[in-house]
């Protein structure tokens, strides 16, 4: 009896191994998002990917394979060889990808029969350009200023800009996942061409990362467009230096109704 049980278990184990031993993915799909033949800068947050591979056919239940897009607009995905369709996540974006025109529902898809590595670039037209980004320390605030230009040539009118954001990080990897962020409403009368300003309390940078004694920070700004809450237009990543290790002033972290300028002496006179 024991021999029969052992033989039965061995047969089950062998069968399970036979089914589990699939070939590893061996085909690489890669490329670059381009705007005016230059790399298009993206969010870079892996929770906000753009592309989705899926397969169709009898017996296939495929929820899709997301392809991560880095902040520099490059992407690379390892796949099994086979037939795929590539499309975009079914959300609105602050740009148009020429190869994926938007329909009434969702986006078009592109068919690929992947038998070997494929390099495919895609061309983007954003609704707005961000340029001339610069940030300075003003009191306890990091103040970023940048220019915005509405882009012509899109198939749909550009939605208006509703919010500007600034993200701070301790390295070059700054995106919408970065924990230190501030946002500012954009005037509804803003035409889409001009300068915008967004600021953040520097103490949020100090307290937002553990044991953060750095005198520098990396930052990016982003634009949120009307009715497009899931993806933003991002700037390049830049660095600001000269951030004090300690702040002598009292800030809104401790005083609810704090507004600059604040005179410490007037509230705490000498005894």
Question: What kind of feature is each model-predicted range?
Answer:
Residues 91-121, 233-244:
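Structured interaction patches on ligand/partner-binding surfaces of diverse proteins
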Residues 57-74:
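Short, acidic Ser/Thr/Gly-rich low-complexity loop/linker segments typical of extracellular
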Residues 1-6, 11-39:
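Bacterial Sec-dependent N-terminal signal peptides
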Residues 37-60, 157-162:
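Short, ordered, surface-exposed loop/turn motifs in non-cytosolic proteins
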Residues 73, 80-100:
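A short, solvent-exposed beta-strand micro-motif common in secreted/extracellular proteins
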Residues 73-77, 108, 118-120, 192-200:
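Short strand-edge motifs at loop-to-beta-strand transitions and within beta-strands
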Residues 134-271:
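Ser/Thr/Gly/Pro-rich, low-complexity flexible regions
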Residues 105-135, 266-269:
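Extracellular beta-sheet/turn segments enriched in Thr/Pro/Gly and aliphatic residues
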